[in-house]
Amino acid sequence: MSSGTILSGAEIIIKALRDQGVDTIFGYPGGAVLPIYDALFKQNHIKHILVRHEQAAVHAAEGYARSSGKVGVVLVTSGPGATNAVTGLVDALMDSIPIVCLTGQVPTHLIGNDAFQECDTTGITRPATKHNYLVKDVNNLARTVHEAFYVAKSGRPGPVVIDIPKDVQFADGVYRTPGESMPKSYRPQVKPDLNKVEEAVELLANAKKPIFYVGGGVINSGPVASQLLTQLVRMTGYPCTTTLMGLGAFPAHDQQWLGMLGMHGTYEANLAMHGCDLMVCVGARFDDRVTGKVSEFSPNSKKIHIDIDPSNINKNIRVDLPIVGDAAYVLEDMIRIWKARNKRADQAALKVWWDQINFWRARECLRYEKTDRVIKPQFALERLRAAIAPREDVFISTEVGQHQMWAAQFLPFNKPNRWLTSGGLGTMGYGLPAAIGAQIANPGALCIDVAGEASIQMNIQEMSTALQYRLPVKVFILNNQWMGMVRQWQELLHGSRYSESYSEALPDFVKLADAFGGVGLRATKVSEVDDVIREMIETPRAVIVDMCVDSKENCFPMIPGGKAHNEMLLGPEDRVSEATPEEGMVLV
């Protein structure tokens, strides 16, 4: 079908999606999008996944996008359909996930009349998206869809909303191909200033105590960026740490990886960040969970910040050398210049630095009490790690809370795009739909949602989606009967006053899985853990595992609110309440 063909608005949308390479849409029908659903019914190229809630549609699209490198596509109706999607859109915005969300709207002549299921979708989603559109002319529809995909995936990725009135979907208009629809005003800088890259290489070569600080921007750049990062880190011999969103950008099995940094990061990663003399930040944004007390953040280091989004530069932390560009281009130039100038690290200084780091490592900050009396959540994850170790096709999603931090600490990620979590917004209910999206994108893979018994209930209805489409996703619940992270902070900072953090009426998750048509498993003893995990993996259907873990276990190490990296606490013997100043409590 060539450019200039006359189609209905709904047909234009489907044709534009096909031309953008879309094979899957996550959505929920309603009156304002029925013409689009009718056009979907008449074709066989794009698969639609019917979720049970519009928030889950966006999270599933996020999981699809994050695990595949493609743009996730969402289709929802007007009014409550659009407003239900907002949480997912903000989540995608904060974690830089490319999403195109199509929303229905009341007919153009009714906009502003408080019509049935009308809301100001563009007004509501303006702060929740990278960009949004309201299309009132069917002849602008194809151009808008193509432009939305370009905006969503270029520069710093993010969600884009296209609001489409119902009469525009019925109207006939001219179809335009992607090549005719490129925006003229939006051209993000992807190639860096070479003079700055050369300066960065000089700083890198002359450093005595350097560290690479890597974020999700490396993963968003694509697999080549992760390969280049690994090459540069190994060439220099320098240590590397990653943020929560950067897990997998550098292989976890490599001795140069110090683990995750930040509030619940490793002792060695945080102290290396505090004590370094050169910090090379690649694709991270110096957020508050990483920096701790800003005025004492890595006080003696020069800081290089590589980011595709210029608005991130100097936003939270003042840096010495900003480099705007795509991580892959910048890393490629750094490697080329390092080789061309025959650069070498100061091996004597580097040995002293590594000796110090290995001294910190010897503290074994992730140690926990080993016992046969109760299942420790860390133990459950260690056994899960052992069970999935032989496989390379494993994708882990999480909900939000203690289980999320333990998963980040105890599950190693050696490749990008295998770790799916809500980092910026911290959205409970993210993990199950994200696992569904990952399973759709990777049909033969093992997709596991590590969950808490509180978080999983936010979008538990999506088990029905998994069963409808015969998706063998696994939900691995660390059930401690509490909102774990809330309880932890109430214990440590609020005098053990557990205000509304205990779940008194939990469902029987084994029976719940059975009610959905899936498989439910439970472990209450240490001796049962391995068998339950093995059965979960071997079962070719959706599974919920109820792993009954220690209800009082807290997540350590941790940096108390308002404290610096070198003031982190390693375990319950450290007094958190005494270590946290009053001004720091507002940062929790």
Protein language model regions, located:
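Glycine-rich phosphate/diphosphate-binding loops that line cofactor/substrate pockets in enzymes
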Residues: 11-22, 63-69, 93, 151-156, ...
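Glycine-rich, anion-gripping cofactor-binding loops and their flanking helix/strand elements
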Residues: 66, 217-304, 412-444, 457-460, ...
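Glycine-rich, acidic loop regions that bind phosphate or pyrophosphate groups
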Residues: 103-144, 166, 246-355, 533
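Thiamine diphosphate
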Residues: 34-108, 110-117, 226, 267-287, 314-316, 405-483, ...
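Conformationally flexible catalytic loops at phosphate/diphosphate-handling active centers
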Residues: 147, 151-206, 365-366, 570
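Phosphate/pyrophosphate-binding active-site segments
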Residues: 2-4, 139, 175-177, 202, ...
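Active-site diphosphate/adenylate-binding microenvironment
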Residues: 13-14, 18-22, 36-40, 356-433, ...
